[in-house]
Amino acid sequence: MARIAGVNIPDNKHTVISLTYIYGVGRTTAQKICADAGVNPAAKIKDLSDEQIETLRGEVAKFTTEGDLRRDINMKIKRLMDLGCYRGLRHRKGLPVRGQRTKTNARTRKGPRKPIRK
């Protein structure tokens, strides 16, 4: 198994699919990485040379991925909560942030139903 950006990449999958195992790298980004590195996207990771894997590592390093990306996202949410803006309050209360209805639905964000006290 190759290790790129601190993630074990599966050997038996195509390069594009394998790169999506990295948090912050989707299909489009993976295709761009392969194109910039000059690697065939349909080639399997086990068939790539060490030199090609090194170029992939270099290309992935240009993007914000894994822990840095998670930290960035959490810091942005924390900033909204500290500002006290509407979006921050919704994050703090655990409700939908982007204007969805909450009278019905929104169960994923609100969590399981709580019994009504009498």
Swiss-Prot record:
Region spans: Disordered: 92-118
Family: Belongs to the universal ribosomal protein uS13 family.
Name of protein: Small ribosomal subunit protein uS13
GO annotation terms (biological process): translation
Keyword Ribonucleoprotein: yes
One GO MF term: rRNA binding
The gene coding this protein: rpsM
Function of the protein: Located at the top of the head of the 30S subunit, it contacts several helices of the 16S rRNA. In the 70S ribosome it contacts the 23S rRNA (bridge B1a) and protein L5 of the 50S subunit (bridge B1b), connecting the 2 subunits; these bridges are implicated in subunit movement. Contacts the tRNAs in the A and P-sites.
Source organism of this protein record: Pseudomonas putida (strain ATCC 47054 / DSM 6125 / CFBP 8728 / NCIMB 11950 / KT2440)
Gene3D superfamilies, A to Z: 1.10.8.50, 30s ribosomal protein s13, domain 2
Top-level lineage group: Bacteria
The protein's assembly and partners: Part of the 30S ribosomal subunit. Forms a loose heterodimer with protein S19. Forms two bridges to the 50S subunit in the 70S ribosome.
Pfam families assigned: Ribosomal_S13
PANTHER family membership: 30S RIBOSOMAL PROTEIN S13/40S RIBOSOMAL PROTEIN S18, SMALL RIBOSOMAL SUBUNIT PROTEIN US13M
